[in-house]
């Protein structure tokens, strides 16, 4: 076993080449305390609900993704932010969309000689308002029964862009692209349920 927790570059948040780069060793507490644009509110809400404070202080965003649990709290938020992940090895670097990285319950594209080094979020996705809701049997120290992360951009009262992701409802968290396509162009003042059902 190799402890990589002391590698500072894995625990930083920076802007590089049009992406916000979140080091895979960034803890949930780090994320909660980081100054980030408004669209990261859902990720901060998520951070405050991962396990206990002790877990938030040592548990990392990269660990949450590599664990590939269907109930991994960070995945729906990162899917809604259109995240990619950076994998490094002695052979070089590769970047995958998050939705291509997690293949199933506890199953990822991570090779034996790779580590997940960073989560990359395009700055063009850093617009809009967000929210994260988690349903569990109790309020704290709970494994999710269901969760949803949503990012919405409005032009007046018209939905110009929306990203909705759910977790704990299947083996892999998913973006609800069909629902998103139905909602884009609709007014928030109308009965959206009529359009959905």
Language-model segments: residues:
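C-terminal structural segment of proteins
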Residues: 1-197
């Amino acid at each position: 076993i190799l402890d990589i927790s002391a590698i500072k570059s894995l625990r930083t948040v920076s802007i590089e080449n049009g992406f916000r780069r979140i080091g895979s060793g960034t803890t949930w507490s780090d994320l909660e305390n980081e100054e980030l644009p408004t669209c990261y509110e859902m990720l901060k809400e998520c951070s405050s609900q991962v396990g206990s404070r002790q877990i938030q202080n040592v548990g990392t965003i990269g660990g949450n993704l590599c664990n590939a649990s269907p109930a991994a709290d960070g995945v729906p938020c990162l899917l809604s932010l259109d995240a990619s992940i950076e994998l490094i090895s002695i052979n070089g670097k590769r970047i995958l969309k998050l939705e291509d990285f997690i293949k199933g319950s506890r199953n990822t594209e991570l090779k034996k000689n790779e580590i997940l080094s960073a989560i990359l979020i395009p700055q063009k996705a850093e617009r809009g308002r967000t929210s994260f809701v988690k349903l569990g049997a109790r309020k704290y120290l709970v494994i999710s029964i269901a969760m949803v992360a949503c990012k919405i951009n409005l032009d007046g009262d018209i939905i110009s862009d929306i990203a909705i992701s759910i977790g704990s409802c299947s083996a892999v968290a998913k973006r609800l692209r069909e629902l998103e396509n139905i909602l884009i162009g609709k007014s928030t003042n109308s009965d959206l349920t009529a359009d959905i059902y």
